[in-house]
């Protein structure tokens, strides 16, 4: 057997259907849509249910988007372990080291994982358990 003799398994490769390309193709003229009617002439819009009241209009509106919502960049204690012992960690340092993409509305430190380094952490928000964990490791926290 040579490389040039290799053939795909029978039935594994299909030729793409080219609809609307002449009567002799077998898929010309109406392109497999039947004759006349809404479905033959064009596409129905997204969510259209044939004239029946669509589900998205049957259900009542709920809730709203708060204009006061702040999107904090989240940082875990495990992530803070990459800094040297005694280092000062600020939002600018986190961005510079590629830990977070941007500061957004600020940085919130969460107590995910374990902190093994003594750090001075400056952030906009801390979870209560994160403050305990940082201070237990000998570090300090500062809300900016």
UniProtKB/Swiss-Prot annotation:
Gly residues bias locations: 23-35
Molecular-function GO terms, alphabetical: rRNA binding; structural constituent of ribosome
Sequence segments annotated as region (Disordered): 1-55
Pfam families: Ribosomal_L27A
GO biological process: translation
Stored InterPro entries: Ribosomal_uL15, Ribosomal_uL15/eL18, Ribosomal_uL15/eL18_sf, Ribosomal_uL15_bac-type, Ribosomal_uL15_CS
Keywords: Ribonucleoprotein, Ribosomal protein, RNA-binding, rRNA-binding
Region forming the signal peptide: none
GO CC annotation: cytosolic large ribosomal subunit
Superkingdom field: Bacteria
Quaternary structure and partners: Part of the 50S ribosomal subunit.
NCBIfam families, per the entry: rplO_bact
Family: Belongs to the universal ribosomal protein uL15 family.
Function, in words: Binds to the 23S rRNA.
Protein name: Large ribosomal subunit protein uL15
Organism encoding this protein: Limosilactobacillus fermentum (strain NBRC 3956 / LMG 18251) (Lactobacillus fermentum)
């Amino acid at each position: 057997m040579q490389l040039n003799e290799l053939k795909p398994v029978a039935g594994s490769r299909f030729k793409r259907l080219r609809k609307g390309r002449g009567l002799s193709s077998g898929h010309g003229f109406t392109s497999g849509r039947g004759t006349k009617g809404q479905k033959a002439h064009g596409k129905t819009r997204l969510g259209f249910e044939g004239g029946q009241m669509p589900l998205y209009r049957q259900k009542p509106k709920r809730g709203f988007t708060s204009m006061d919502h702040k999107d904090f960049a989240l940082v875990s204690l495990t992530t803070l372990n990459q800094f040297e012992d005694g280092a000062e960690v600020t939002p600018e340092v986190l961005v510079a080291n590629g830990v977070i993409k941007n500061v957004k509305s600020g940085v919130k430190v969460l107590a995910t994982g374990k902190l093994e380094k003594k750090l001075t952490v400056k952030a906009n928000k801390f979870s209560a358990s994160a403050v305990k964990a940082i201070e237990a490791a000998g570090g300090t926290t500062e809300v900016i």
